[in-house]
Amino acid sequence: MGRGRVQLKRIENKINRQVTFSKRRAGLLKKAHEISVLCDAEVALVVFSHKGKLFEYSTDSCMEKILERYERYSYAERQLIAPESDVNTNWSMEYNRLKAKIELLERNQRHYLGEDLQAMSSKELQNLEQQLDTALKHIRSRKNQLMHDSINELQRKEKAIQEQNSMLSKQIKEREKILRAQQEQWDQQNHGHNMPPPPPPQQIQHPYMLSHQPSPFLNMGGLYQEEDPMEMRRNDLDLSLEPVYNCNLGCFAA
């Protein structure tokens, strides 16, 4: 007796429904992978659970490319079937297409941030890890390149500053040398001009023959002249020519 055909209907038990969903989902993903490998086909599988969780499978993680290809194909097919379709319908389709693309990008962003990873299979996690490793390699390579460029720029500036300092030091030394030479020349010229003349030969004179001019001096009574030293000397010796002069006159008179 053959096996009877099982009627398909919704499983009322929540736990049984969840277990069945997990088993069938794994089988469906396995079948999709097998057909993509055996037949060299591009497969894209999208499944939403009753809680709204997304489960997907794509050949070589090319979900975006497959969806874009599907949209182009379906859009071209619709244009051939109904070339005179309403413009509003086209705008609605474009809106739905862009909305689906935005949702896909947001989901990928959450995956890159380590969120909503429960619904991903081991292969999807492995592909995500490879993408992150590749991104990290590019980031580190760019960072090392920037650091290398910064170091080269600092070394170039340091070399330029050293050359400038060397040039300034050389100019300062040359300037100091010129100033020392000018100072030595100036000292030699000043030494030659400021030498005192040799003293004149001394003449021996009698003390009484030295000319002496009376010098005025100020006294409380008025202005007086200093007394002549010769007169002072004559008075000190109490010598006078007046008696001799009178005597000679008397002799001539007699």
Swiss-Prot record:
PROSITE patterns: K_BOX, MADS_BOX_1, MADS_BOX_2. This is Floral homeotic protein APETALA 1. PANTHER family: SERUM RESPONSE FACTOR HOMOLOG. It is found in: Nucleus. Keywords: Activator, Developmental protein, DNA-binding, Nucleus, Transcription, Transcription regulation. Residues 88-178 form the K-box domain. One of its GO terms (molecular function) is DNA-binding transcription factor activity. SUPFAM superfamilies: SRF-like (SSF55455). One of its GO terms (biological process) is positive regulation of transcription by RNA polymerase II. InterPro entries: MADS-box/MEF2_TF (IPR050142), MEF2-like_N (IPR033896), TF_Kbox (IPR002487), TF_MADSbox (IPR002100), TF_MADSbox_sf (IPR036879). Controls floral meristem identity. Is also required for normal development of sepals and petals. Is required for the transition of an influorescence meristem into a floral meristem. Interacts with LEAFY. Residues 3-57 form the MADS-box domain. The gene is AP1. One of its GO terms (cellular component) is nucleus.
